[in-house]
């Protein structure tokens, strides 16, 4: 699915917060990466973040 830059930032930020608070990491992370934002970006690039976006359909008048 294609996300806007704002949706992408929100997803990565929310997932990074979860990781920082102790949530389990879904992918195998290299030992040199310890920053939650970097881990969340890796998860986003691999399409494994367990967060979904519900987009409201546009209402035409």
Swiss-Prot record:
PROSITE patterns on file:
RNA_POL_K_14KD
Instruction: Print the keywords alphabetically.
Output: Cytoplasm, DNA-directed RNA polymerase, Nucleotidyltransferase, Transcription, Transferase
Which GO biological process categories is it annotated with? transcription by RNA polymerase I; transcription by RNA polymerase II; tRNA transcription by RNA polymerase III
- Record-linked InterPro entries: DNA-dir_RNA_polK_14-18kDa_CS, Pol_omega/Rpo6/RPB6, RPB6/omega-like_sf, Rpo6/Rpb6
Under Gene Ontology molecular function, one entry of this record is:
DNA binding
Subcellular location field: Cytoplasm
Q: What top-level class of enzyme does the UniProt entry assign?
A: transferase
GO cellular component terms, alphabetically, are:
cytoplasm; DNA-directed RNA polymerase complex
Pfam families linked to this entry: RNA_pol_Rpb6
Catalytic activity line of the entry:
RNA(n) + a ribonucleoside 5'-triphosphate = RNA(n+1) + diphosphate
Q: What is its EC number?
A: 2.7.7.6
Keyword Transferase assigned to the entry: answer is yes
Family membership noted in the UniProt record: Belongs to the archaeal Rpo6/eukaryotic RPB6 RNA polymerase subunit family.
What the protein does comes down to:
DNA-dependent RNA polymerase (RNAP) catalyzes the transcription of DNA into RNA using the four ribonucleoside triphosphates as substrates.
Share what the entry says about its subunit structure, partners included.
Answer: Part of the RNA polymerase complex.
What is the name of the protein in this document?
DNA-directed RNA polymerase subunit Rpo6
Q: Give the source species.
A: Thermoplasma acidophilum (strain ATCC 25905 / DSM 1728 / JCM 9062 / NBRC 15155 / AMRC-C165)
The encoding gene: rpo6
């Amino acid at each position: 699915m294609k996300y806007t830059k704002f949706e992408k930032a929100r997803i990565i930020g929310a997932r990074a917060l979860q990781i920082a608070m102790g949530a389990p990491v879904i992918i195998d992370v290299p030992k040199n990466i310890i920053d939650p934002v970097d881990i969340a970006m890796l998860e986003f690039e691999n399409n494994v973040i367990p967060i979904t976006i519900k987009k409201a359909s546009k209402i035409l008048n």
